[in-house]
Structure formats: structure tokens, C-alpha cells
A protein has these predicted regions:
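Membrane-interface helix-loop-helix junctions at transmembrane boundaries of multi-pass membrane enzymes
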Residues: 36, 77-87, 168-188
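Perimembrane helix-loop-helix junctions
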Residues: 28-31, 39, 62-95
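Transmembrane alpha-helix segments characteristic
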Residues: 177-201, 250-254
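Membrane-lumen/periplasm interface segments of multi-pass, membrane-embedded glycan/lipid transferases
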Residues: 81-93, 99-174, 229, 270, ...
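Short acidic/glycine- and proline-prone juxtamembrane loop motifs at membrane-interface regions
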Residues: 8-15
């Protein structure tokens, strides 16, 4: 998805790449401060954060969340040393953030017209509509192209979701308390953030949210999960054992099962029986017979 956005000259691509770079830099820096590397890390973090915050109007919020999430893994007793190494970078990024916010407010990029979607003034209706769209947002993070009219093959999404799910569940199993809090927090934000951010404009613009908007933050989920696993001795021992072979085998088997389920569902969705209303208590076989007899009568 990032490559597609970059090819279409979309600032979202730069924003996502900068978010990934900032996550990677801060996680390695905060978890293992090293006096010999702290200065270089602060420079990399400043460059990534500046590129992020200057990309789009939501970018300052992502900056705050990425820094806050990374602070959860800050090594105990390292706060002062990290601050000494990064205070100049923090000042520079703070100035860039203020400039970005001033530009956003000054040009009125967040201004919207009058109410055109009054049904979303109801919080209940809005929340239900957004929750029903969560699966669409997830697929859009992986890749839905064009004007949201070109999807990848189903097995592409199945493979991505299987791999990311495997990473996250494994990291939750072996991670420490603050590491688990980071992962659970990111999972929660994947649902809560769009709900909160879009609500003020939904009555005027409708449901305009796309999954890619959240990618600068959510690229941190597989990255953080992989970082947690790589830092655990138990996990490294498992990966070096004979059992490691069965992990991708099991993952591919699960993906294959999901693919078979998708094929069955897509075949059924084309069936005239599925499009017909099946009364309560009536079996599918009876519905098929009723549908067939109706078709015969219409052809006479």
C-alpha cells in the first residue's frame, strides 16, 4: 500500500514511512540506551519526526501517540540519559510541530461545509456504522487501490492477517507487562482513533475515513511485536529448535482453511437461494424447492 501511495505522489506514503522510521528508532533507543549511540539515534528520531509531523493534518497526533507508546518500553533509570541526549532534537521537533499546527489552522484545512449527512448526528448510528466498517479499514491498510475499487486477492489479506496475528499473539504470550500494554493499546487505537477523529466531521462529510490514514501509527504494531519477540531468549530458543519448522506450516494451513471458507462464501453469495428471503423455521432445501417452483411458474 505504501508503494502504491508513493507511486501516486500521495503525502500519506511519506507519512507512513516516517512513522515506521520513528517507531523503529524510538523502540531501539528507549529500550536499550547506549551513550555511544544516543546522539545518532536522537538525530534519526528528529529527522523522522519532522518528516512525519509535516506530512498531513493528523500527523501531530500520530507523533504524540508514537512517542507515548515508545516511552512504555523506556528502560528503568534511563529517562535522564535519554533526555540529555535528545533534548535538542525534542526542541527542534516541537518547533516543527508548532509550525505544522499553525499552517493547518491558518489555511483552514480542517474547515468543512454545512451538514449534509444528518443521520450521523446520532452518536449511536455513527458508532454502529463505524464498527461495521472496521473490517474494511483493516483491508484498506493492507491494500485497496484506485478509488477504493480495486482489491487484492483474498489470500493476500488472509496471509497478512495471519502473519500479523501470529506475531501479536506470540508477543502477548511472552512479553512483559508494559510491552503487552503497548500492543493492546495499539489494537485498541485501531478502533477508537478513527471513531474519535471522524465524529466531529461525519455529519458534514459522511464516513470518509480510510484505513491507510491510520498506517503511520499502526505500522508500529507488527514492528513492536517483532521487537518484543526478538528480545526474548525463550523465543530465540524456540526459533532455533526443530519446532520452528511447524510455525510457518501451521500459519499456511490456517491461511488455506480461511481461503477455502472464503471460496465457499463467495460461491454461496452468487446463489439465488441466498438472495431470497428464507422464512424462520424453513430449511434451505425447502427454500431451494420454493425458488425452483417459482422460476418454473414464471417461465410458463
Amino acid at each position: 500500500m505504501v508503494l502504491f501511495l508513493a507511486g501516486s505522489v500521495n503525502p500519506n506514503a511519506l507519512e507512513i514511512a516516517a512513522g515506521f522510521a520513528l517507531w523503529a528508532t524510538l523502540l531501539s533507543w528507549f529500550s536499550r540506551p547506549d551513550p555511544e549511540l544516543d546522539r545518532a539515534r536522537s538525530i534519526r528520531a528528529a529527522i523522522a519526526a519532522t518528516a512525519l509531523v509535516m506530512s498531513r493534518s493528523l500527523s501531530p497526533a500520530f507523533l504524540v501517540l508514537i512517542v507515548g507508546g515508545s516511552l512504555l518500553v523506556l528502560e528503568r533509570g534511563a529517562a535522564r540519559r535519554v533526555w540529555r541526549a535528545g533534548r535538542i532534537a525534542a526542541i527542534v521537533v516541537g518547533a516543527m510541530t508548532i509550525a505544522a499546527l499553525a499552517w493547518t489552522v491558518g489555511v483552514g484545512s480542517l474547515d468543512t461545509p454545512g451538514v449534509s449527512e444528518p443521520e450521523y448526528e446520532s452518536i449511536k448510528r455513527y458508532v454502529v456504522a463505524m464498527l461495521l466498517s472496521v473490517s474494511d479499514f483493516e483491508r484498506q491498510m493492507i491494500g485497496v487501490f484506485g478509488w477504493l475499487d480495486t482489491s487484492a486477492e483474498p489470500h493476500v489479506y488472509n496471509l497478512w492477517f495471519t502473519m500479523i496475528g501470529f506475531l501479536v499473539v506470540s508477543a502477548l504470550a511472552v512479553g512483559a507487562g508494559r510491552e503487552r500494554l503497548l500492543l493492546v493499546g495499539l489494537l485498541a487505537l485501531s478502533v477508537v482513533f478513527p471513531l474519535v477523529v471522524q465524529y466531529p466531521v461525519a455529519p458534514r462529510l459522511g464516513l470518509i475515513w480510510q484505513g491507510r490514514y491510520l498506517l503511520p501509527l499502526m505500522v508500529g504494531l507488527p514492528l513492536a511485536a517483532g521487537w518484543v519477540l526478538a528480545s526474548k531468549e525463550r523465543w530465540n530458543e524456540l526459533m532455533s529448535s526443530r519446532w520452528a519448522f511447524w510455525i510457518p506450516v501451521g500459519t499456511l494451513a490456517a491461511m488455506r482453511c480461511q481461503r477455502a471458507s472464503d471460496r465457499r462464501a463467495s460461491a454461496e453469495s452468487a446463489s439465488p437461494v441466498d438472495s431470497a428471503r428464507i422464512p424462520p423455521g424453513e430449511s434451505r432445501a425447502n427454500a431451494s424447492a420454493t425458488s425452483a417452483s417459482g422460476s418454473t411458474e414464471c417461465s410458463r
